Amino acid sequence: MAGKITVVGLGAGDMDQLTIGIHKLLTKADTLYVRTKDHPLIEELEKETKNIRFFDDIYEKHDQFEAVYEEIADILFEAARREDVVYAVPGHPFVAEKTVQLLTERQEKENVQVKVAGGQSFLDATFNVLQIDPIEGFQFVDAGTLSADELELRHHLIICQVYDQMTASEVKLTLMEKLPDDYEVVIVTAAGSRGEEIRTVPLFELDRNVALNNLTSVYIPPIKEEKLLYHEFSTFRSIIRELRGPNGCPWDKKQTHQSLKQYMIEECYELLEAIDEEDTDHMIEELGDVLLQVLLHAQIGEDEGYFTIDDVIKGISEKMVRRHPHVFKDVKVQDENDVLANWEDIKKAEKNTSESSLLDSVPKTLPALSKAAKLQKKAAKVGFDWEDVSDIWEKVSEEMKEFSSEVSEAPHEHNLKAEFGDILFALVNVARFYKIEPEEALTMTNDKFRRRFSYIEETAKEEGVELADMSLEDMDKLWNEAKETERRS
């Protein structure tokens, strides 16, 4: 190869931690390249080394760290084509050092050998000062890429590069998504050096009146109190597993996919009610009840050895990616109509023509009004539809006459149901033409009836009158009062 870069770790901050060989590499280099001045060893190195090139000025040039690291790598590769390069970084070269990753990834392309000479990681000193054993479970993350979704709160958590107040504030807000505001965290600065500082603070004070620099990390002890983990999906999953386990609940253990069907339907309708009420707290509760049903079915599947919740999540994740090529691939769309058209085409391809009828994809268990709307919509896509709404109204009138004719003769229960069903089906066509969801429309009317009849009940109770003793005219008067009250409000 055309040149060589030797990467040296400066350790946690004490010159005594360096081996004789590494000390010689640092002090004998014609030019020592150092990522940053912010390290306890720099003052001593400046006394012993002929020429040091720091890269702190590169940080000032760029708004993004990625650009900083790329430029440092470019400079080092260029220098290595002229002479052997020694590059020093804090701690260990392979611990939280993006520039070292870039050097090793690009060495073949640049035709430059990259050799790592080692160095003590600050993690060793941090484990020592905190007196923790990483074998118990340990997570190490960069403050700049911290995500609440990726945190494993049952393990020791160390967040590095909490170098200023803004970064500390972002870390605090991210942790507050998962932890109580007063949860105790530990701020560790310059672990293993003479300037080592340790401070325990409640989480809400993480960015208040604390000294922070490039050598600062934050330690979050593992959560021991189970209720603090109730927001975690894994905790909920373990609760359901225990409910159906050997020492679990007799009722939960007895349930099957069939026995739970009614509860799924009930919970979904209760969720719809909460949505209609625009009641956020009620929605949270009902979404939880629906999720409970999903987890119960998944746990039954796991207990029987057929599938787990992981299979469920994997399946829907794959489906969402597959059916959104305009998001996850390079497919271009103009609007939501293109999206829906793509969705149907992809869905059809997934079915692999296994359905013998266009209508086979409409679930048989849908509520009747919703099913009617879906059946009509499917048929309309291939041209089986009315062109003008006046034709639909004519069909409604025709079905009304047929029903009236059936009633006027000696009515047969089956025929009455069939003719009345035809009226409803025709009215669903009207709703579809005007883009009305018939199930929602009827739900609104049901709710309206409930409100107005409740007004009649309450008024009668206030007046000390039994409903059974009221005339239809009296109740109709109260009904109109309720209607007028609603109109004014």
Swiss-Prot record:
Q: Which domain of life is it from?
A: Bacteria
Molecular-function GO terms, alphabetical: methyltransferase activity; nucleoside triphosphate diphosphatase activity
Q: Which CDD domains match?
A: NTP-PPase_MazG_Cterm, NTP-PPase_MazG_Nterm, YabN_N_like
Q: Which GO terms describe its biological process?
A: dATP catabolic process; dGTP catabolic process; dTTP catabolic process; dUTP catabolic process; TTP catabolic process; UTP catabolic process
The family database entries (InterPro entries) matched by this protein are listed as: 4pyrrol_Mease, 4pyrrol_Methylase_sf, 4pyrrole_Mease_sub1, MazG-like_dom, NTP-PPase_MazG-like_C, NTP-PPase_MazG-like_N, NTP_PyrPHydrolase_MazG, Tetrapyrrole_Mease/MazG_pred
Q: Please name the Pfam families in this protein's record.
A: MazG, TP_methylase
Question: What is this protein identified as?
Answer: Uncharacterized protein YabN
